[in-house]
């Protein structure tokens, strides 16, 4: 009898994430396959749809589907993405996104805790240290008893004790300094801030805390304490001043008369002196808003007991190789790596295997951080003081350490703030993720990062409504050969200088800005000479002192000199005759809420409201300009109060933010759609329709409105023509925010001005960098001195003058390595930046 043999066909595993009909933001119903298990780059000009594809489709669907598999109880505690506007996404893995702007950590976070390097250090100091006997203070040799949970015997007094555990050495737990609670910082009342204007009387509000933090009737109580309240504060006797600042909390009988003057009430009231008023308010603070009210009366300094180390005296006693935990945490990562490598050899032979395991765990984490160029950071550096790029690299290194597989990682511009010397380290981290069986999608503009991709997708061809299409896809070689690609010339390194080079003889023709400084942070004492009326790039590896030199020294010094005030303590002298303004144009978001839009920030909306108020329809309806305000006007949408969105409180689920169903995001009520103004081609437009247009579209639609046209043209010239007028400013990228802030400065004479930009190329495509260079040219042509802190090689190549800091980061930096034209820097053997020019 014949046997029937069943043959099971093995199903092929998916090879790609299949996206069909994606319409998120400006995506044009696109279909694209993203290879699985590869490093995939997404390129395109700013606003072309890169992030919409990577974050709005791939990450949104990958994370949402994973979360939907969890219980309702768990989901309600997590932020959930809504369904992406896409027909179908197949084979998308669970997704994690590393965003462009990681959140700023709290006051208890340090570089060591963020990277978990502190965990290894604490374990090392618990298991391998010379511990101190709590009975007689003698030191005990390292012993395996600690790891075994056994007691130690003091060789001096013979008594037994248990060594501290790793938890006992944590400043967020048992090892916290009792005085500062493990923050390393003490807040004390600044008495000088309590009475800022001593020419006022107490009745006139001389004692500020009594007016802002306490009942106003404290003035009357002070009078009952024997203080004259009707004479200028600077005429009070020392005894009276002491009562105001430090008087005892005694009850006084007063006759309280309300402000309306009707009736008087006898009261017994306890006197709160000015200092205690602030201390009492500080003790009751429950949130950041409350702290802001009190902060103006406080000064911060290192804790007097722990010296800013955050650790208790007991936690600072164990020693390894002659130093304690606080001293180890004060090292830079680079120094700590060298120190940790030498620890096992310093211990008894029987302890070396255990110490080696602990040290290896530290070194494996540290290796990636060093590769990413963070070796200059000290382990005790407060997490809140790290830059955006530094926080992003910490986040990236943490992800690699997890060694997960089958995950989709979406990285949003990980090269931000990264010196060219550290790009190889970044690529190595991404390759590690791919080698572990993950898919990495990286949105970036750095051609050195994009050139390493296994597969490249280019969005475009332009920004905004004209973008949202896939204009090239394939291997890097295939994209380089693509006729429609806009990134191809930059991948092929067809680079040329766009601005004429100023010769050495002409460089200082328009004058000098000179400054001499003492040491501050890691910057050594130095003298710097900056040419006026030029584009000057300040370069150097991360931590080399660029920010300290420019933002913490040059700008404050120029502002102080212009105002006739004292120079900062570390500035010896500054010579900048004729400089009246020093403007920092940074990448911080504009506005704190959705009510701030491109049109309101650029002073366009007010002019549009006046224009619509002049129309016959508005006059007939009785609408003045104020009625067209979406914040307070009669024509704002009553459902969303002019925000364009509403928040739904869904039981058992997180609040959901949706577009307002009444106005569909326009912010205006139905009545606003009945007021029209004639456009360029005779078409009739409403204000909500205009606010939904891009800057470039609005240029054609607002012919006849000279002020509006001038401001729109400025935005167009700044490369912001793709932004819609109603776009909320907090949602703009860092580069967009910088250029929008510049709008009010364009067109005026600038020969008394210095403009400082902190990494303005963040988020910019190489083509956008060319637009930015033309913006800088516009400022320089008006006489301005433009100083740019930058890593972008295209911008550095086009600078008139370069000041290169370094040679390394941290203690290995802080000096001017060389200064001159880009060609001079490229020829300088000591310059790390020069090697890449």
Q: Could you describe each region identified by the protein language model?
A:
Residues 1-837:
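Conserved phosphate-binding elements of NTP-dependent enzyme cores
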């Amino acid at each position: 009898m014949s046997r029937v043999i069943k043959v099971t066909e093995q199903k092929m595993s998916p090879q790609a994430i299949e996206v069909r009909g994606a319409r998120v933001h400006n995506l044009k119903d696109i279909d694209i396959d993203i290879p699985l298990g590869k490093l995939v780059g997404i390129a395109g000009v700013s606003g072309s749809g890169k992030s919409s594809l990577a974050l709005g489709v791939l990450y949104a669907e990958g994370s949402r589907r994973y979360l939907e598999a969890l219980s309702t109880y768990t989901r309600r505690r997590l932020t959930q993405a809504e369904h992406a506007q896409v027909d179908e996404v197949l084979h998308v893995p669970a997704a994690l996104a590393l965003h462009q702007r990681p959140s700023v950590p709290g006051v208890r976070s340090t570089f060591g805790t963020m990277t978990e390097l502190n965990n290894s250090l604490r374990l090392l100091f618990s298991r391998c240290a010379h511990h101190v006997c709590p009975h007689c203070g003698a030191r005990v040799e390292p012993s395996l008893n600690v790891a075994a949970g056994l007691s130690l015997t003091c060789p001096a007094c013979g008594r037994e004790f248990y060594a501290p555990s790793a938890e006992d050495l944590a400043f967020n737990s048992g090892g916290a300094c009792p005085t500062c609670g493990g923050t390393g910082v003490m807040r004390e009342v600044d008495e000088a801030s309590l009475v800022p204007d001593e020419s006022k009387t107490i009745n006139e509000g001389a004692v500020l805390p009594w007016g802002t933090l306490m009942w106003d009737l404290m003035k009357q109580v002070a009078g009952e304490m024997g203080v004259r309240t009707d004479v200028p504060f600077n005429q009070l006797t020392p005894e009276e001043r002491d009562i105001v600042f430090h008087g005892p909390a005694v009850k006084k009988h007063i006759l309280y008369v309300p402000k309306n003057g009707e009736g008087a009430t006898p009261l017994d009231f306890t006197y709160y002196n000015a200092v205690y008023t602030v201390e009492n308010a500080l003790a009751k603070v429950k949130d950041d808003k409350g702290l802001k009210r009190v902060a103006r009366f406080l000064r911060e300094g290192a804790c007097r007991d722990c010296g800013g180390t955050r650790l208790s005296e007991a936690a600072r006693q164990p020693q390894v190789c002659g130093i304690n935990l606080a001293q180890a945490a004060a090292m830079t990562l680079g120094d700590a790596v060298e120190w940790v490598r030498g620890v096992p050899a310093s211990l008894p032979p029987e302890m070396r295997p255990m110490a080696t395991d602990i040290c290896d765990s530290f070194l494996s984490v540290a290796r990636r951080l060093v590769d990413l160029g963070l070796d200059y950071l000290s382990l005790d550096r407060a997490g809140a003081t790290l830059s955006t790029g530094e926080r992003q690299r910490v986040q990236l290194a943490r992800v690699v350490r997890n060694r997960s597989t089958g995950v989709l990682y979406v990285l949003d511009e990980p090269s931000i703030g990264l010196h060219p010397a550290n790009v190889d380290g970044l690529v190595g981290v991404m390759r590690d993720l791919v080698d572990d069986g993950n898919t990495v999608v990286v949105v970036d503009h750095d051609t050195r990062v994009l050139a390493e991709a296994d597969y490249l997708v280019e969005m475009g061809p332009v920004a905004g409504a004209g973008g949202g299409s896939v204009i090239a896809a394939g291997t890097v070689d295939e994209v380089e050969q693509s006729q429609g690609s806009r990134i191809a010339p930059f991948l092929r390194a067809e680079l040329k200088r766009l601005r004429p080079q100023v010769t050495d003889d002409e460089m200082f023709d328009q004058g000098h800005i000179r400054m001499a400084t003492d040491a501050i942070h890691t910057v050594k004492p130095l003298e710097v000479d900056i040419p006026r009326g030029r584009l000057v790039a300040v370069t150097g590896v991360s931590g080399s002192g660029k920010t300290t030199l420019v933002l913490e020294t040059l700008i404050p010094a120029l502002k102080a000199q212009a105002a006739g005030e004292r120079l900062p303590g570390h500035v010896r002298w500054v010579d900048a005759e004729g400089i009246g303004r020093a403007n920092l144009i940074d990448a911080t978001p504009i506005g704190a809420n959705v009510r701030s839009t491109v049109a309101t920030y650029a002073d366009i909306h007010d002019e549009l409201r006046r224009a619509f108020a002049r129309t016959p329809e508005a006059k007939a309806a009785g609408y003045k300009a104020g009625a067209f305000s979406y914040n307070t006007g009669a024509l704002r949408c009553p459902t969303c109060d002019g925000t364009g969105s509403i928040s739904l409180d869904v039981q058992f689920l997180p609040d959901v933010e949706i577009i307002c169903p009444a106005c569909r995001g326009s912010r205006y009520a139905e009545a606003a759609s009945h007021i029209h103004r004639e456009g360029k081609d005779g078409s009739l437009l409403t204000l909500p329709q205009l606010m939904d247009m891009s800057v470039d579209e609005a240029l054609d639609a607002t012919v006849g409105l000279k002020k509006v046209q001038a401001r729109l043209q400025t935005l167009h010239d700044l490369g912001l023509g793709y932004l819609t007028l109603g776009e909320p400013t907090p949602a703009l990228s860092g580069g967009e925010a910088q250029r929008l802030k510049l709008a009010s400065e364009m067109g005026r004479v600038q020969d008394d001005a210095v403009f400082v930009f902190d990494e303005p190329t963040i988020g910019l495509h190489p083509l956008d960098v060319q637009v930015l260079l033309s913006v800088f040219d516009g400022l320089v042509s008006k006489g301005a001195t433009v100083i740019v802190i930058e890593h972008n090689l295209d911008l550095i190549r086009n600078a008139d003058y370069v000041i290169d800091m370094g040679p390394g980061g941290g203690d290995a930096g802080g000096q001017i390595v060389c200064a001159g034209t880009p060609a001079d820097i490229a020829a300088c053997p000591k310059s790390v930046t020069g090697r890449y020019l």
